[in-house]
Amino acid sequence: MKKRTLLLFIVVFAFNQSSIYAQNTDVFSPKYIKETMVKVTDWQMKNQIHKETDWTNGAFFAGVFAAYETTKSPRIMDSLMAMGERNLWLPHPRFDHADDIAISQTYIDLYRIKKDRRMIQATIDSVLKMRKIKGNEEKKHGIAWWWCDALFMAPPTLAKLAVTLKDPSFFVQNDSLYKQCYDLLYNKEEHLFARDAKYLWNVQGEGKKEANGKKLFWSRGNGWVMGGLVKLLKEMPKNYPTRSFYVTLYKEMAARLLSLQQADGLWRASLLDPASYPGGEGSGSGFDCYAMAWGINNGILNKATYLPAVQKTWKALNSLITPAGKVGWVQPIGADPRRNFNSESFEVYGAGAFLLAGSEVIKLKK
């Protein structure tokens, strides 16, 4: 008990120390948001720790492109183009693994500006190959998108291809793969996703549990889904036949996540047992902020209900950033809640989540 009390004190003290940076700043001013997005982009660009086409950077560069759209910084555009050229505009090598086309979201966004087909051809080839050949993921797991993170990594790429190429078959392909993942992992009582089949309970009520006996639902995993839903819905035509399915899912999850937000504005690594995981987590909270702000901006979420929550989260997220631009309190790569991060913990996807959030928060009307 003493150890746990000491841990909680250390977490709260460290959080308060890092909060000093944002306490006396208007974090909602467009000038501040743009400057902070550039600062976060610059710091993370200089502190890369993964291959640029890795899924981690797929999430980061999605945020960097959002930073470009927000700031119109030529330097950010130059950095994005240089990244694509260095990697020959190739996705990661596994054609049937959702992670490996996460980077393609950014390739397609850049293609829409530059109109150079070679920027997206390898992505098109990879996605079409899935229609012809059963890949290793489906052979091993029964479905290709067998973990909830996949719903951020791949659906936006398929949706962007559908719109860019004016080919709805990519939406159809997404619908099939998405529904398989949804049917396997979505809990219709909790309105949350299990990370993968290992975290499902059987009919006898047996399975992985938190210390309080509740089911294990991972904050970042559900943040991935929310962020992916937004990026999918941004592309999908209003009259697309299955759009209502995605909107309903988005609203269900938004309402549930709103009820699980903690007093400081952040979500804990474990959604249903926050007391066991002191200290807010930056990446899941960033994706949730992005998703809810977008919903307000597009009239899908009730402003009176969700705006206070988004404002609270945005303030809290800014308290996680060092003066140099590092986004701290980000849980390392994993698949479930852990107590393995602190103010010094960063990951590229944490920066990406913050940048995506900033791109929508700046559009909010108070």
Which sequence ranges carry the predicted segments?
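Bacterial Sec-dependent N-terminal signal peptides
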Residues: 1-24
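CBM-like carbohydrate-recognition segments
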Residues: 23-58, 66-86, 90-104, 110-129, ...
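Acidic-glycine-rich active-site phosphate/pyrophosphate-binding loop
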Residues: 32-37, 78-80, 125, 129-136, ...
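Surface loop/turn signatures of beta-propeller and other carbohydrate-active proteins
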Residues: 36, 86, 90, 136, ...
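The tetratricopeptide repeat
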Residues: 60-63, 103-106, 150, 154-157
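Short, well-structured alpha-helical patches and their helix-loop capping segments
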Residues: 115, 122, 142-153, 166-173, ...
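Asp-box/WD-like beta-propeller blade repeats and closely related beta-sheet repeat scaffolds
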Residues: 120-158
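Extended ligand-binding clefts on enzyme/binding-domain cores
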Residues: 148-149, 159-271, 278-289, 301-330, ...
